[in-house]
């Protein structure tokens, strides 16, 4: 089994556990970072965006709700073929409302994330609209060695204010 196949196996098992744990509350799930780009290395963690309705307030409460998922996956995450290190999950938890409010984290996701689960198209629509807005602004991701940054509006004038995506406007686009 190749490293990429191992990550694919983990993602399949993970999605099944997420659906079992969150049920109808699971709105969407995406993998980002090196695994989302399809370029994991030995020891790469699995960066996840979990969009779940009715999440408890606070990161610790959200992690506590996620712990059974991780526990059920322990054998898949730790038992690999010889030479494969254990794999860590790094979830980011958002409610649909928090996704609508936006986050700088989503900038890279429009290019690098792979949506694993999104039955209503919520996350795909959000990413599509954000991607379109970035294009409209002329935004670009500028690479410097192994790092990058975003130039969101190259023609920005001093004192000018702009929005990436109005909080509720994108909802109207999918209605």
Question: What is each model feature region?
Answer:
Residues 1-21, 50-100, 106:
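Metal-dependent nucleotidyltransferase catalytic core
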Residues 1-27, 37, 42, 100-175:
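The feature captures the alpha-helical scaffold/lid subdomain characteristic of nucleotidyltransferase
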Residues 31-32:
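Hydrophobic/anchoring residues in structured secondary elements
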Residues 38-56:
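Conserved N-terminal glycine/acidic-rich loop preference
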Residues 44, 49, 61-63, 69, ...:
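Residue-level signature of transmembrane alpha-helix interfaces in integral membrane proteins
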Residues 44-46, 86-89, 112-113:
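Short glycine-/polar-rich loops that comprise or flank the Walker A/P-loop
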């Amino acid at each position: 089994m190749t490293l990429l196949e191992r990550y694919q196996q983990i993602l399949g098992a993970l999605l099944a556990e997420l659906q079992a744990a969150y049920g109808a509350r699971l709105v969407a799930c995406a993998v980002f970072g090196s695994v989302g780009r399809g370029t994991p290395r030995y020891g790469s963690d699995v960066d996840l965006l979990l969009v779940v309705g009715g999440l408890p307030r606070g990161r610790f409460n959200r992690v506590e709700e996620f712990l059974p998922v991780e526990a059920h996956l322990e054998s898949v995450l730790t038992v690999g073929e010889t030479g494969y290190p254990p794999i860590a999950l790094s979830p980011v938890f958002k409610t649909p409302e928090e996704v609508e409010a936006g986050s700088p984290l989503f900038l890279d996701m429009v290019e690098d994330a792979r949506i694993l689960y999104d039955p209503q198209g919520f996350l795909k629509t959000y990413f599509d609209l954000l991607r379109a807005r970035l294009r409209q602004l002329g935004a670009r991701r500028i690479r410097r060695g192994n790092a990058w940054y975003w130039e969101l509006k190259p023609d920005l004038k001093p004192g000018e204010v702009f929005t990436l995506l109005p909080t509720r406007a994108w909802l109207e686009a999918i209605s």
